[in-house]
């Protein structure tokens, strides 16, 4: 039984057509989220070309022998999309996880123009561009964006062609968790720019999922505590916006601490 199936949907009014060639949505079959995907797509058309990747999952299809838990299955799905996008000769692509929730603000022309301008400046660099996350540490990139040094959530990210090429050159068995090499940068397998928009334009609820059950217990406890503190396990706002403010304050405090330590050593 084939583990994957791509279903293509065509629109003619994609919001981010100037920045991305296609959107991919990772959907684990029979997880109850298909109707949610279609509801989102009935209101939001991120690009003219949208693919839904139907993933049967490692338990119901034959995949590589080391793919034996949810995080590895998700990595395999991302890589399947990277390969498909390269075969189609796409440049930048947006990948959404099937619990994504767009903000109405993504339709506002000022945000669309800001994103298009940034993606154009990034050109052919190896980068990811984050439309929404729970940021932890960030530093200013320009007036509309931040360098996201550490963040939570890879549910709505634009991936450059060069980034796809570089990731596909890594031995898949060495990629244990998608968040670890992108959001937390664990292992530093490759160097790339990770830029985030200054406000969240796409959300997800942070709940206890099959994927999170495989996290390190210490990391999971911290993440779930922070999610509950922000109340983003129940509703996306105002928790997401508050996390952007908290991250800004935390980053300033950390920067001031580092500067003070440097000054003391002079």
How should each PLM-predicted stretch be described?
Residues 1-96, 100-266:
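An acidic/histidine-cluster motif and surrounding catalytic segment
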């Amino acid at each position: 039984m084939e583990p994957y199936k791509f279903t293509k949907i065509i629109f003619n009014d994609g919001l981010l057509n100037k920045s991305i060639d296609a959107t991919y949505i990772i959907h684990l079959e029979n997880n109850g989220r298909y109707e949610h995907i279609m509801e989102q797509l009935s209101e939001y058309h991120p690009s003219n070309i949208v693919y839904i990747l139907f993933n049967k999952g490692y338990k119901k299809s034959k995949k590589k022998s080391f793919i034996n838990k949810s995080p590895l299955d998700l990595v395999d799905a991302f890589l399947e999309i990277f390969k498909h996008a390269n075969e189609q000769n796409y440049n930048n692509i947006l990948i959404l996880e099937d619990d994504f929730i767009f903000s109405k603000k993504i339709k506002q022309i000022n945000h669309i123009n800001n994103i298009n301008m940034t993606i154009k400046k990034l050109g052919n660099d190896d980068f990811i561009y984050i439309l929404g996350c729970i940021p932890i540490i960030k530093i200013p990139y320009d007036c509309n964006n931040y360098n996201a040094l550490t963040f939570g959530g890879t549910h709505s990210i634009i991936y450059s062609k060069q980034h796809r090429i570089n990731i596909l050159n890594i031995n898949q068995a060495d990629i244990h968790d998608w968040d670890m090499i992108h959001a937390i940068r664990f292992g530093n397998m490759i160097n790339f720019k990770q830029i985030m928009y200054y406000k969240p334009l796409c959300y997800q609820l942070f709940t206890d999922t099959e994927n999170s059950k495989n996290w390190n217990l210490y990391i999971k406890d911290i993440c779930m505590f922070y999610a509950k503190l922000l109340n983003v396990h129940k509703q996306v706002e105002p928790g997401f916006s508050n996390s952007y403010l908290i991250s800004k304050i935390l980053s300033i405090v950390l920067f001031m601490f580092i500067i003070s330590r440097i000054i003391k050593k002079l």
